[in-house]
A protein has these predicted regions:
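Membrane-interfacial helix-loop segments of redox and metal-homeostasis proteins
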Residues: 2-380
């Protein structure tokens, strides 16, 4: 997260009361609206999203930075932290999704769609300096640059929704879910084993490059807390935590208000998207956690230090934020999600597509890192 957006003067008060009060009141109002809408259980998703925003910001948990440090210098602590998060979530998601009716994992077919989408997402992630969840919590935490990324992310995801059916038509392999072959507990063992193998590979690469692979204490705590909160989202929403679908719905609703007709778009005639577009966002679980996350990050930032009015970043940096957001939004929709929905949700569900997404996105990050200097951004 950019510290320039939150840098206080030496004699500034510790709290930014207006923003803190606005975030807390906004959350309370949102919870009340969801409850009054006849969905009291879903109100918990707002609270869980709020807690996720606080946890991400306080732990400075960043997928984009962790991947960049690993690729540039071999430092693996951030990636190990991400794997710990996934392992915690998998302990509940894999067996419950397999054993309890009404629950499901994050699964997707393996084909050109997931590979291309993840690769493009990886490029955008490095230009934007954040992923889907990172965009939400840094925007909520006061980063004007990330507000630009968020707006273009939303636009890109709507464009991606129009292209997704054509990419799926290219073919691929049906979803491969470990629990379908090994049962709930065998599937869990396979998921945890795959995470362990990835962790050992990261540690080996870090050692070979003379870098550290031990995550900071704050990252370890953050990973465990975020993993537990992800379990909470799963238990309440009956599906692993997702970030980008909510953003796609927001964009489509805005486009509809502007006069755009989605009746001829195949994606928006599928049952889930069609229902989300026609109903209130208060009925969409992804939207509720997204809104809660923004408000939670705002509250956490305001409770730590005042929001400072600072000059906008250079034009090149803003252009990178816009391009990165557009690429991430498009890639997330084509590739079945972002770091949260595709990587964390997929691997924690025991779905092979999660690892395919990770590998393709890592390749995209290599390209994105090489492009960063063109926009005045450091490769580190």
């Amino acid at each position: 997260m950019s510290t320039s957006t939150l840098a206080p003067a030496a004699d500034s008060p510790r709290l930014d009361w207006p923003f803190l009060i606005a975030a807390v009141l906004g959350t309370a109002v949102l919870v009340a609206l969801v409850a009054l809408d006849g969905q009291p259980a879903s109100a918990a998703l707002v609270i869980l999203g709020f807690a996720l925003g606080v946890a991400f910001l306080r732990a400075e948990f960043s997928f984009a930075a962790a991947w960049r440090r690993f690729l540039v210098s071999g430092e693996g602590g951030g990636l190990i932290g991400a794997l710990l998060l996934i392992a915690v979530a998998a302990l509940v998601i894999v067996p419950v999704a397999a054993l309890v009716p009404g629950f499901g994992g994050a699964i997707a077919p393996i084909g050109p769609s997931v590979v291309i989408g993840a690769f493009v997402f990886g490029i955008g992630m490095q230009l934007a300096n954040g992923c889907g969840s990172g965009t939400l919590y840094t925007a909520g935490g006061g980063s004007g640059r990330m507000l630009i990324t968020l707006a273009l992310f939303i636009a890109g995801s709507v464009i991606g929704s129009l292209h997704l059916p054509a990419f799926l038509a290219l073919g691929g392999v049906d979803p491969i879910l470990a629990s379908n072959y090994l049962g709930p507990w065998g599937g869990l063992a396979a998921a945890l084993a795959s995470i362990a193998v990835a962790a050992f590979a990261i540690m080996a690469i870090a050692r070979a490059r003379g870098a550290t692979f031990k995550p900071r204490r704050l990252i370890v705590i953050g990973a465990i807390v975020i993993g537990l909160l992800s379990i909470g989202v799963f238990l309440v929403g009956h599906h692993p935590w997702s970030v980008t679908f909510g953003l796609t719905v927001w964009g489509a609703k805005i486009a509809t208000l502007a006069g755009f007709d989605f009746s001829g778009a195949a994606f928006w005639q599928w049952p889930g998207p069609k229902r989300a577009l026609s109903e209130s966002i208060l009925s969409d679980t992804s939207s509720l956690t997204d809104l809660g996350m923004i408000l939670g990050a705002m509250a956490a930032a305001a409770a730590a230090k005042p929001f400072a009015r600072t000059a906008w970043p250079p034009a090149k940096s803003l252009l990178a934020a816009a391009i990165g957001g557009l690429l991430m939004g498009w890639g997330a929709r084509i590739g079945f999600g972002c770091n949260i929905g595709a990587f964390v949700g997929g691997v924690a569900s025991g779905s092979l597509h999660g690892w395919i997404w990770f590998a393709a996105a890592l390749g995209g990050c290599v390209v994105g890192i090489r492009l960063r200097p063109l926009f005045g951004l450091s490769r580190d």
